[in-house]
Amino acid sequence: MRRLTISGLLISLAKLCAGMEINVPSSSDVWTSGHIEPLEWSVVSTDPLQANVWLINEVEYPPTSRYIMTINTFDENATFPALDLSPGYGYQISFTSIRDDSVIYAQSGTFYIVGGEGISSTTGSTFQSMTTFTSSQTNSGHASASTSIPSTAITVTANSTIYSSATSSFPYSTDVSVSTGTSTDIVTLPPPASSTSSFSTITNTSMIPSSSSFTTTTGSPYYNTSSFLPSSVISSASLSSSSVLPTSIITSTSTPVTVSSSSLSSFTPSYSTNLTTTGSTTTTGSATVSSSPFYSNSSVIPTSVPSSVSSFTSSSSSYTTTLTASNTSVTYTGTGTGSATFTSSPPFYSNSSVIPTSVPSSVSSFTSSNSSYTTTLTASNTSITYTGTGTGSATFTSSPPFYSNSSVIPTSVPSSVSSFTSSNSSYTTTLTASNTTVTFTGTGTGSATFTSSPPFYSNSSVIPTSAPSSVSSFTSSNSSYTTTLTASNTTVTFTGTGTGSATATSSSPYYSNSSIIVPTTVSTSGSVSSFSSSPSPTSSFSGTSALSSSSNEETTTTTQVTYTTSPEETTTTMTTTTCSSRPEETISTVSTTSTVSESGSSSASITSTYPSSTLSMTTSHLSSSSVHSSSAHSSSSRSSSMSLPPSAGSSTSLQRISLLCVFIPLLFLF
């Protein structure tokens, strides 16, 4: 896989019209920082007389370029000055036009620059490596793998792209050992299974040792309803009928995976690795709350009711409700559809749209400021009769009488006679009064506010605001009803329609409405509802990880991981394919599948295919009934080992790395 760069394209275009070619340095040459180095090139007669010399590096990040000097091209050699240069790989010499540096005449191969402290370079045979894999299934359940590879420096963070570049002296050899451990707690639900996995690496070279490790702990909470989760349960003993009820909330934690090592120096070409993980977690569940306290309504809920009032249940946000209360204090706020019945002793009036504002203790009174009537008023010593046309008529009877005719009804009468005041201007009315009773009937629209002692009343759009302690009180901010009010000495009945909402609280309850709401506090005193959750919540995760890496532009390793987790089992499948620069030439394919069930049993299968050999292995074990599944394994014992002969070429080390990466997940199984 050859890197395509803008400079490379310009070189190709320049070579069409010029024959200049750089011979020294060549590919894989090694220069030393702070030393004089030779430059050699060849020209043809059509080449320019002069050129600028640049030192560039497009492999390292960020790319660099540095002007060095101007040369006479037909000299065909020059001396590169002793400069302080950063050690690394990917350097090139570039000859450009003295008038326009974007015009490139020639460019050298890629070479190395090492530090000037005297690091030696030892030439020898081509680097060879041997990879050995040994797997055994015994009571301890352990697997290990080791290999010799070029030293590298890699830093990994979750969902990131990994780049590393390092150089060191020949010969180079790195020992890598990998150890993993896992402990899985399996108990009878609840709670769900939780697990802790750890992974560590130790990398030692002749120059710099390094090590890294990470630990991941996962768990699941007991519940996950549609939108609410209990925050505390005071006493689980009082909720013995529940099917799955925790005494505390279990949280799930996860530590990001981080693998790091010290910076190393080696001649190993750059590696580039990309790891991408995608997936989703789904948790389902439902809960039902049943209780034996306090209310029954549709969409408006009392805020306070004593324990003697009916129970409240709700499974919808739109319904019709009847609320009944006796000798209690009920506060009603909100708008909504509903009806209610109030009982008091004694009440006084019946009307449609206008209600008396003041009544003596023994005689009803009625006041009105209405000024629009056509009236005839007749008075004698014993009676007053009022009749009219237009907006209303009325008859008054009293002893003795008081008035003459006018268009406004009297606003003041002695205590033994009714009084009438009204702010309503539109109704048809007949009014009859005696020393003890005022009866008013009529139709129309209006509004009024009244306070009386000892009774209270309701009308079409305004509800009483105050009542004595022995009688229910009712307040409302609702202003839209259609109402019929009837009163006798003992009963006031109010019915109406509208819309509204409210919030209910009480001294020892909890409630449910709309869809699924789980109580946040349960009191152990009094009559407490039970809590049940059914079915038990389940969590599952499915996703795919893709890991690809390349080295030395000759090999490519691709790892695909597919995994699915649920309370029943966890299955992970990893397939790693290593290819040369030609995709049709597959160096190796390794597939690993591992499954761990809820009961503690596990199995794994590995199939590795190489041009000359194939390895297949299947292992399984079943835990005992103890809490820790890692404490017991099958008594059977099986082991397999494989040694791969070294192969020529720089792809050998990557091939071994790929094999090691594939076998690592097997260690988590045991």
UniProtKB/Swiss-Prot annotation:
Alphabetical keyword list: Endoplasmic reticulum, Glycoprotein, Secreted, Signal
Compartmental location: Secreted; Endoplasmic reticulum
Broad class of the protein's primary localization: secreted
Glycosylation: residue positions: 77, 159, 204, 224, 274, 297, 327, 351, 370, 381, 405, 424, 435, 459, 478, 489, 513
GO cellular component terms listed in the entry, alphabetical order: cell surface; endoplasmic reticulum; extracellular region
Keyword Endoplasmic reticulum: yes
Annotated spans, Disordered: 526-651
InterPro entries with a match to the protein in the record: GPI-anchor_Adhesion_Reg
Transmembrane listed as a keyword: no
Signal peptide limits: 1-19
PANTHER family according to UniProt: SERINE/THREONINE-RICH PROTEIN ADG2-RELATED, SERINE_THREONINE-RICH PROTEIN ADG2
Protein's name in the database: Serine/threonine-rich protein adg2
Lineage: Eukaryota, Fungi, Dikarya, Ascomycota, Taphrinomycotina
